[in-house]
């Protein structure tokens, strides 16, 4: 019986040390952060847990999660570049965000015109879309996109479903055509 109790206490101690840190889908590998500014990163950990955030460009921040486990930090970002960066978020366990770029972030939102992907819909093809998709790997290090799933809400949301994507032949067909042509033009103008 003593061995069983000792084992249970040991397992409880291991579980408490292995606290989980979670992030919303909008904060992840392959994301782009706005250059030369203070960006907010947030997530969830155990209630009242210490959270440390460190970026490969030298920025660091720490916070303590609130009673519901939510935390938020602000990081200073450097000038934009195409050099991939890394962000580590730690609170018990560790989340590593790889292949993060620093540059220009633009939100493209709307209805059917904005939603039309480069791959087109059914009979609706995008002029030049197939060529862009075929050559998309050339833009892999320059353009990223986050396709947020359809949803609605009447209050601000901390979590929205979606994931950051590099612009590649495998992902380009899902990217908004309008957003792509804007990003490509902006990339040429700013370089």
Regions found by a protein language model. Give the residues of each.
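C-terminal segment of classical bacterial N-terminal signal peptides
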Residues: 14-18
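Cell-envelope and extracellular/periplasmic
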Residues: 19-191
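Sec-dependent N-terminal signal peptides
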Residues: 4-13
